[in-house]
């Protein structure tokens, strides 16, 4: 038995047909975009359901043939071989349908606020933070996404002490959300004369870009300070108070922004980041309260959790959450093979979700 929710699948097929019918009539521009987007999301599931039902019917015909005592031995052998192949195909389709029916993260389609901070390791940590940012930047380009740097504090020898960027593209959060955590690098610094391997770290935070309707921020909960922007050495770099610091009093979250000469633009950027951080903090609190659910996740999303090691001497990348090692570090750092890690993490997360629903992977 497949244990698929046939009634629910019937409703989805009917809804898909209704959307296709709407496109044949006169549709407003906004509705056209909405309908085509929804169809593109439903198409893989609908195709899998139709294929599954065709295979199910074919298997029924084969069973009838095998139960018929008049079926000759040669025909029976052919039917049994075809049944085995169709059985395997049916199981694949059932798994596809179950995965497609898993509850979606409401934020999966959102843009991303990507924050990378150098951790332990001094200058090497800053250089590694720069490597990570370029890795995500190249990966984003391969996905057809855009990356806009919101704020950056450069390291003394290169890289970044901290960099915040907005990654814009459909499904950005779904792809990048498992990247949050501590990334560790092991390599020989250029300044190391004895050839010793140094270990450094950088912290990555991937936050969904949230809108005002997603987070209720009361004006009375904000403390807003303005000041003159400062350069690397602490000197004031302009005469107007364009820098802004916003403190969310209930949570203690502070965002400082001074990259633009416009106070208005700095304030808007700071509020965007603040909303994402408040939303993320609330999600962290909810996840912590749901200990049973948290165990089924690929990592907890805890910013202090070491999730991945990049070992340059061995040319390997190891993701500790799923014990996956790829000996293609240059391709991962170039953004080209990062998708292999992300896909493996996504699959593991889906397997855990299916197991929680009582389905074997």
From Swiss-Prot:
GO cellular component annotations of the record: cytoplasm
- The domain of life is Bacteria
* Function according to Swiss-Prot or TrEMBL: Peptide chain release factor 1 directs the termination of translation in response to the peptide chain termination codons UAG and UAA.
The protein's PTM annotation reads: Methylated by PrmC. Methylation increases the termination efficiency of RF1.
Region entry Disordered, spans: 286-305
**N5-methylglutamine occurs at which residues?**
235
Q: What's one Pfam family here? A: PCRF
Query: Top-down, what is the taxonomic lineage of the species of origin?
Result: Bacteria, Pseudomonadati, Pseudomonadota, Alphaproteobacteria, Hyphomicrobiales
InterPro entries from the UniProt entry: PCRF, Pep_chain_release_fac_I, Pep_chain_release_fac_I_sf, Prokaryotic/Mito_RF, RF-1
The encoding gene is: prfA
Q: Localized where?
A: Cytoplasm
Where is it mainly found?
A: cytoplasm
What is an example of a GO molecular function annotated in this UniProt entry?
translation release factor activity, codon specific
HAMAP family recorded: Rel_fac_1 (MF_00093)
Q: What is this protein called?
A: Peptide chain release factor 1
Classification via NCBIfam families: prfA (TIGR00019), PRK00591.1 (NF001859)
**Entry similarity comment:** Belongs to the prokaryotic/mitochondrial release factor family.
Q: Which UniProt keywords apply?
A: Cytoplasm, Methylation, Protein biosynthesis
């Amino acid at each position: 038995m497949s244990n698929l929710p046939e009634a629910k699948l019937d409703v989805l097929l009917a809804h898909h047909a209704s959307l296709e019918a709407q496109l044949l009539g006169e549709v407003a521009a906004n509705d056209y975009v909405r309908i085509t987007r929804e169809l593109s999301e439903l198409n893989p599931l609908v195709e899998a359901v139709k294929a599954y039902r065709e295979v199910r019917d074919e298997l029924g015909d084969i069973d009838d043939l095998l139960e018929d005592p008049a079926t000759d031995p040669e025909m029976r052998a052919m039917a049994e071989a075809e049944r085995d192949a169709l059985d395997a195909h049916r199981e694949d389709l059932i798994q596809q349908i179950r995965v497609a029916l898993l509850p979606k993260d409401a934020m999966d389609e959102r843009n991303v606020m990507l924050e990378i901070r150098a951790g332990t390791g001094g200058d090497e940590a800053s250089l590694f933070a720069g490597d990570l940012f370029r890795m995500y930047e190249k990966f984003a380009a391969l996905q057809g996404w855009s990356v806009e740097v919101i704020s950056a504090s450069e390291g003394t020898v290169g890289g970044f002490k901290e960099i915040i960027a907005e990654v814009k593209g459909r499904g950005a959060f779904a792809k990048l959300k498992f990247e949050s955590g501590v990334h560790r690098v092991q390599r020989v610094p250029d300044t190391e004369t004895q050839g010793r391997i140094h270990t450094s770290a950088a912290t990555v935070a991937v936050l969904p870009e949230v809108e005002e309707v997603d987070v209720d921020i009361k004006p009375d909960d904000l403390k807003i300070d303005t000041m003159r922007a400062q350069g690397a050495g602490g000197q004031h770099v302009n005469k107007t108070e364009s820098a802004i610091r916003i403190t969310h009093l209930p949570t203690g979250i502070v965002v400082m922004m001074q990259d633009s000469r416009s106070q208005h633009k700095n304030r808007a950027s700071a509020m965007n980041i603040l909303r994402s951080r408040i939303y993320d903090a609330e999600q962290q609190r909810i996840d912590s309260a749901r200990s049973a659910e948290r165990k089924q996740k690929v990592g907890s999303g805890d910013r202090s959790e070491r999730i991945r090691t990049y070992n340059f001497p061995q040319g390997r990348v190891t993701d500790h959450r799923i014990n996956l090692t790829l000996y293609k570090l240059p391709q991962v750092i170039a953004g080209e093979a990062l998708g292999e890690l992300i896909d493996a993490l996504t699959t593991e997360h889906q397997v855990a979700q299916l197991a929680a629903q009582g389905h074997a992977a």
